[in-house]
């Protein structure tokens, strides 16, 4: 979670699902994963491209934490044409990850920066994002490419947390995760 945005998203999803209080908390869940010899890598690339056996990696592990946009990438980049993605999306474990662009307070050209953000939010740019960044567009009017429509889903009820709660607790949660996973 400290070095990977999908890892952090998974940690946050477990906090939403199991909570911090009660008979079985997110820490208990992670302790159970640890006790079951879960493999944690330094980042998404190693996990997906090296260790995962189900995608384009030739690894030894059958499950991986990735993005809802991984199945279309598998279809698009398959060496041999395939009709169905070898990967899927488990909706119950999804956390909506949102990537931002912003203008810094003391930016030397805030007007130009604003125009660039407007450009990035425009339909042409947003419709170009899925097949280049393999993320969903922020502009709801942007059309998705067929490979996205056919090979993935947008989870209807992803886990969410108030951004202020994430900001206030992220470091503590990561430190507590470290204490559970790296005793």
Predicted segments, located by residue:
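Periplasmic solute-binding protein
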Residues: 1-17, 97-102
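Extracellular/periplasmic bilobal clamshell ligand-binding domains
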Residues: 146-183
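Sec-exported extracytoplasmic/periplasmic mature domains
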Residues: 15-20, 34-38, 53, 57, ...
């Amino acid at each position: 979670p400290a070095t990977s945005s999908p890892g952090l998203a998974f940690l946050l999803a477990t906090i939403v699902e199991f909570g911090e209080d009660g008979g079985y908390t997110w820490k208990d869940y992670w302790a159970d994963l640890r006790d079951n010899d879960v493999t944690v890598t330094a980042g998404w690339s190693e996990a997906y491209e090296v260790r995962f056996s189900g995608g384009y990696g030739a690894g030894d592990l059958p499950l991986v934490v990735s993005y809802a946009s991984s199945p279309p990438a598998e279809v698009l980049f398959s060496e041999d044409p395939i009709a169905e993605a070898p990967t899927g999306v488990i909706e119950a474990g999804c956390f909506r990850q949102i990537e931002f662009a912003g203008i810094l307070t003391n930016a030397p050209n805030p007007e130009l920066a604003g125009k660039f953000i407007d450009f990035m939010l425009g339909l042409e740019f947003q419709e170009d994002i899925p097949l280049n960044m393999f993320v969903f567009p922020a502009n709801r009017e942007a059309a998705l490419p067929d490979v996205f429509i056919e090979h993935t889903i947008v989870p209807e009820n992803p886990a969410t947390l108030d951004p202020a709660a994430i900001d206030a607790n992220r470091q503590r949660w990561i430190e507590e995760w470290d204490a559970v996973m790296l005793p």
